[in-house]
From Swiss-Prot:
Zn(2+) binds at C145, C147, C187, H190. The lineage of its organism: Bacteria, Pseudomonadati, Pseudomonadota, Gammaproteobacteria, Thiotrichales. This is Thymidine kinase. GO terms for molecular function: ATP binding; thymidine kinase activity; zinc ion binding. ATP binds at S9, A10, M11, D12, A13, G14, K15, T16, D87, E88, I89, H90. One of its GO terms (cellular component) is cytosol. Belongs to the thymidine kinase family.
């Protein structure tokens, strides 16, 4: 029986690395995973997912206007797939999350989503909130704060100061380095205090 999985964490916990490991394991056993990602995230270029340690794999980059159910149904009709793996699920829409549930329920294909639970403002991404409600299986991918506690928040740091207002979606790419901006995974206490090191 296929299931809808949501594997979530703060940044830098290894979500994409886990996705790549799962894809490898499927392929190593003669199975066919379909890897999808958001076209918003261009760090690895379009049609590719890449972990922070440098491992990458081809993928299909979709926009928030794409119908994922139709895409998977069409792809599956000519290339039988055994699993759908989605990176950066927080960049997709709630409607697309329901389409993923439809893939599980109607096509009987497992779907494993990887993404952030909250943005740097401490607010849940809409898709993450929906997945927390409807996914069959929830799995937290853990990482740690600089203090050693579990990191569950993402802090945006600009010019050495924690940012707590602005656009809730800011992609972590090379352009942020130009304006001395970075993301840091921290525990709740240090997120509230704005302490990142």
């Amino acid at each position: 029986m296929a299931k809808l999985y949501f594997r979530y964490s703060a940044m830098d916990a290894g979500k994409t690395l886990d996705l790549l490991k799962v894809a490898y394991n499927y392929e190593d056993r003669g199975r066919k995973p379909l890897v999808l990602t958001s076209a918003i995230d261009k760090r690895a270029g379009l049609n590719k997912v890449k972990s922070r340690i440098g491992i990458d794999q081809d993928a299909y980059s979709l926009t928030d206007r794409d119908n994922i159910f139709e895409f998977v149904e069409n792809y599956n009709s000519s290339n039988k797939i055994d699993c759908v793996l989605i990176d950066e699920i927080h960049f997709f829409t709630q409607e697309q999350v329901w389409q993923l549930a439809e893939i599980v329920d109607e096509l009987n294909i497992p779907v494993i989503c990887y993404g952030l639970r909250t943005n740097y403002l401490g607010q849940p991404f809409e898709t993450a909130a929906l997945l927390l409600a409807i996914a069959d299986t929830l799995e937290e991918v853990k990482t740690i704060c600089h203090c050693g506690k579990k990191a569950s928040f993402n802090m945006m740091v600009q010019n050495g100061k924690a940012i707590k207002q602005g656009n809730p979606i800011v992609v972590d790419d090379d352009s942020l380095k130009e304006i001395d901006t970075k993301y840091v995974s921290v525990c709740r206490k240090h997120w509230k205090e704005g302490v990142y090191e």
